Amino acid sequence: MASQTLVVFQASNQSQLPPPNATLCDGAQEAWHLLHKVLPTCVVAICSGGLLGNLFVLSVFLVPRRRLNAAEIYLAHLAASDLVFALGLPFWAETIRNGFHWPFGAPLCRVVNGVIKANLFISIFLVVAISRDRYRALVHPVASWRRRRRRHWAQATCVLIWTAGGLLSIPTFLLRSVQVVPELNVSACVLPFPHEAWAFVRTVELNVLGFLLPLAAILFFNYHILAALRGREQLSRTRCGGPRDGKTTALILTLVAVFLLCWTPYHVCAFLEFLLHVRAIRGCFWEDFTDLGLQYTNFFAFINSCLNPVIYVFWGQLFRTKIWELYHRCLPRKLTAVSSSRRKEIFQIFWRN
């Protein structure tokens, strides 16, 4: 999924760049050395997994020539968002490896960071939309729209989400620039704030619009989803279509839990950065903790983009069924000596949890 920044260097000189001449807390230099040495390799590995995994997920959703239902539309868009985000990771890895030197020029500085910023919002807004769709299907099944209307609503919602992500990333596209940082002897891709008030605006945008409000909606929807599942467990076993709905809901609940686990530490560190900027907290410990924390929690958030395909395969029984459908379509007719039912039985045994 998306990250707010590759490198942040504000006009006030508060940054994620390591301050070389400042007095560091014990162990900070070693922590920065470890970051420059180990993190780029890990990011490249995550990039590879994210690209391959999300391409596979999209192929499973889009190759079969049939209409996707509402839940599948949202999940396909989430995979597309993760895929676009993963494309920006090699730039971040190379920047860390070079000690925060940006060798790719100003246009890519704006484009790469703008796309990553947009996908931060797109990913969490999609998780909200997915949770809301399950909420309507399970908590208000009678009032839930017909399948066709739900599909159209899902398509329109995804268009609005991608548009909102693009609009919220406009300041990044406009303000990002490559500037010389004499203290580090590098030309860094930085985000200089034109006014001190921008620090507050950025915090509202990132932590409130990009996390707290969506988090409240996600918790609300999923609390009621879990309550509905507990109250209707017996009914779901006998109702036509119940097992399919339950499988989809289990997959989505897992995606939501992993998403929050990966992204919450980053937003905590981003808020601490704001507190440092306004001098609400001070001191060597908080500066080093926040600067290093933003880098490492960025990496932890990156893991989400390659974990989602793994969740689809190992927790999503419905997704595995779609893989079987794709396999059945692509299977050469010459191999029909084994009965279709037998091949499906073998395939299901292979994927059994």
Swiss-Prot record:
Molecular functions per Gene Ontology? bradykinin receptor activity
What GO terms in the biological process aspect are recorded for it?
cyclooxygenase pathway; G protein-coupled receptor signaling pathway; inflammatory response; response to mechanical stimulus; smooth muscle relaxation of the bladder outlet
Which ranges sit in the Extracellular compartment?
1-41, 94-110, 176-207, 273-295
User: Which InterPro entries does this one have?
Assistant: Brdyknn_1_rcpt, Brdyknn_rcpt, CCR1-9-like, GPCR_Rhodpsn, GPCR_Rhodpsn_7TM
Topology class, membrane: Multi-pass membrane protein
Q: Which residues cross the membrane?
A: 42-62, 73-93, 111-131, 155-175, 208-228, 252-272, 296-316
Disulfide bonding pattern of the chain: C109-C189
- Where is the protein localized? Cell membrane
Keyword Glycoprotein in the entry? The reply is yes
Q: Which SUPFAM superfamilies match?
A: Family A G protein-coupled receptor-like (SSF81321)
> Where do glycans attach?
N13, N21, N185
What keywords sit in the KW lines? Cell membrane, Disulfide bond, G-protein coupled receptor, Glycoprotein, Lipoprotein, Membrane, Palmitate, Receptor, Transducer, Transmembrane, Transmembrane helix
Source organism's superkingdom? Eukaryota
Q: What is its main location?
A: membrane
The segments annotated as topological domain Cytoplasmic are 63-72, 132-154, 229-251, 317-353
GO CC terms in record: plasma membrane
Q: Which Pfam families match?
A: 7tm_1
Function summary: This is a receptor for bradykinin. Could be a factor in chronic pain and inflammation.
Name the chain's protein.
Answer: B1 bradykinin receptor
**Organism, as annotated:** Sus scrofa (Pig)
